[in-house]
């Protein structure tokens, strides 16, 4: 894995936690999963135990085991592995942060606690500071996802002077549609070498224009190659091509959102596209319906989003 001092950029797959039909973690497929991300999707950075990975539905012991398996299987294959260590309990977050450092992760990320919430910037920074201090050698990222946490403190406000309080702070996973807030984060901190990682896959091109340095998302598990094509087009200033790639990705996301799209459905799609069994989600989530899977499969076949990927009925080149 890369030096933790290397800036995190490009695509970062928010990894799924594979499970058996009985709801236990299926560690046996993680090595295959790593190879699939690198060799098929061209994605070499991962974000473990986040929303997509059902991190907050796992026990502390399970989260440690999952993190360790990804680090072990990703060694010399992945560039950077960031472990989400957020929890409702400060002590649990600190324990997870210490474990991430012990196993050789490249960074840690934390969401705001969302039951007994911090109601202002100072409260939130005090919490984040204590977690970061538990792993003082690791880069620290704030995971901003107000729609799920209910913590409405603007990221722009949080970033103001944050390195004075948290010296290891290196960036932000911004999972919100407020592009004004995101843009101000970039604009007011452009002299700092922060990683600005956008977390709304269907809006990534807009965020790139505003200065995003990378992206963390669930769709990069199975649409990583297509999204990388968009990044490459943007980099060479072929904005028309980049826009076409984004629109193509949006057509699929828009379709599945209308059907009902979340972690359960992400697992079903990843199983379908990769051939690696992701299993069901953990309760209270329910397994995606067969109707959803059939409809998603048909939509994937109708769009130019798949290259060198296998569906159940055989190899499917770009359709």
UniProtKB/Swiss-Prot annotation:
Binding residue positions for aceneuramate: 51-52, 175, 199, 201-202, 218
Top-level taxon of origin: Eukaryota
EC code: 4.1.3.3
Gene Ontology MF: a single term: N-acetylneuraminate lyase activity
Catalyzed reactions per annotation: aceneuramate = aldehydo-N-acetyl-D-mannosamine + pyruvate
InterPro entries (UniProt xref): Aldolase_TIM, DapA-like, NanA
Associated pathway: Amino-sugar metabolism; N-acetylneuraminate degradation
Major location category of this protein: cytoplasm
GO cellular component assignments: cytoplasm
pH-activity note: Optimum pH is 7.6-8.0.
Transmembrane segments: none
GO biological process: carbohydrate metabolic process; N-acetylneuraminate catabolic process
EC class of the enzyme, as a word: lyase
Gene3D superfamilies found in the cross-reference section: Aldolase class I
UniProt xrefs under Pfam families: DHDPS
Keywords: Carbohydrate metabolism, Cytoplasm, Lyase, Schiff base
Localization per record: Cytoplasm
Record note on quaternary structure: Homotetramer.
Family: Belongs to the DapA family. NanA subfamily.
Protein task: Catalyzes the cleavage of N-acetylneuraminic acid (sialic acid) to form pyruvate and N-acetylmannosamine via a Schiff base intermediate. It prevents sialic acids from being recycled and returning to the cell surface. Involved in the N-glycolylneuraminic acid (Neu5Gc) degradation pathway.
PANTHER family listed in its UniProt record: DIHYDRODIPICOLINATE SYNTHASE, N-ACETYLNEURAMINATE LYASE
Name of this chain's protein: N-acetylneuraminate lyase
């Amino acid at each position: 894995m890369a030096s933790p001092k290397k800036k995190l950029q490009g695509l970062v797959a928010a990894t799924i936690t594979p499970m058996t039909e009985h709801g236990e973690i299926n560690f046996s497929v993680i090595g295959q999963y790593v190879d699939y991300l690198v060799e098929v999707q061209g994605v070499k950075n991962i974000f473990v135990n986040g929303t997509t990975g059902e991190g907050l539905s796992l026990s502390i012991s399970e989260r440690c085991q999952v993190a360790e398996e990804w680090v072990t299987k990703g060694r010399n294959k992945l560039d950077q592995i960031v472990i989400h260590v957020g929890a409702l309990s400060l002590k649990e977050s600190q324990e997870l942060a210490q474990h991430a450092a012990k196993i050789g992760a490249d960074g840690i990320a934390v969401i705001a606690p969302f039951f007994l919430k911090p109601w202002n910037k100072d409260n939130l920074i005090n919490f984040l500071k204590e977690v970061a201090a538990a792993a003082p050698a690791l880069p620290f990222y704030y995971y901003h996802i107000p729609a799920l946490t209910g913590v409405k403190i603007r990221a722009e406000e949080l970033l103001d002077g944050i390195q004075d309080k948290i010296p290891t702070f290196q960036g932000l996973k911004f999972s919100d549609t407020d592009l004004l807030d995101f843009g101000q984060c970039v604009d007011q901190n452009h002299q700092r070498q922060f990683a600005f990682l956008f977390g709304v896959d269907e809006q990534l091109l807009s965020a790139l224009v505003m200065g995003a340095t990378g992206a963390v998302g669930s769709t990069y598990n199975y649409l990583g190659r297509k999204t990388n094509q968009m990044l490459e087009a943007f980099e060479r200033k072929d904005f028309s091509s980049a826009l076409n790639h984004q629109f193509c990705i949006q057509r699929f996301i828009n379709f599945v959102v209308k059907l009902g799209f979340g972690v359960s459905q992400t697992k079903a799609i990843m199983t379908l596209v990769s051939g690696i069994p992701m299993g069901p989600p953990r309760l209270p989530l329910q397994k995606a319906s067969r109707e959803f899977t059939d409809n998603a499969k048909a939509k994937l076949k109708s769009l130019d989003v798949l290259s060198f990927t296998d569906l159940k009925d055989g190899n499917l080149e770009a359709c």
